[in-house]
């Protein structure tokens, strides 16, 4: 345990390269009273990691360790740590300082894989308040899928959406957030519509319980198919991950008094090109969702401990294959999550 491998972003002329480095392993003797030394065992990627890597948002992450999502084992704890002990299996929170309550803009200054070093390293030190026990019986690879994608889906549908049995949900695409949203919605007794450009991915979604699948390459105005399927009622919830390129169809899909959880920007950062009047006319609630708090994460873990859910891991890569994993993320071929094993 002499060296800690890690990947960092290194600025090039237009974006960032991924550069492998080593550094000394943090010493347990140097832990502050409330800190824990974690051996990272697995990391998962999110679309946000592509945004940072390709510099799509113009954010300076030069020298930072990528990836917000990972899980591992506690090796040592500081003198005042009361929540954990060595050997505990944990995941880190996306926002390490957001423990509970309302979101504060200050939390943006402390996000893993952004302003703070992320999880693509062998060892990391965290305050005990930034960690959560992983679900019982889950592998590190499975648990690594949770901190961003699963928590986001949970907050969108459960805490903010108040999803009820018998309601209807539309999830866009088959990435990490959307597939967790599909799985949570089915466990909670909802009917789910899934959109994708791939019939093969839609078949996988059906196997997870999707009630209606729409290939948006074949049916660009997919809201019409959804509208007919729903008995011209619309759906109660839309998990909107596309952004400006899909927002018009999402607005046309949502029911009166419905809910749109605005989560992603897969189609870019520009403004919507359509009128927002349907939101007003249908009395729709629009929620911006940026992951969630530690309380949200722990509530979700409690749910997972009492329900059967298997994270959908599309491919696993070795640590030294990290650039290949990022390329695969960019290809958008994956269904669910991409994991890097350490």
Task: Show where each model-derived region lies.
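Glycine-rich beta-strand-centered segment in the early N-terminal region that forms part
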Residues: 26-44, 54-99, 115-117, 135-138
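C-terminal capping/lid region of NAD(P)-dependent oxidoreductase domains
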Residues: 2-4, 232, 308-312, 323-342
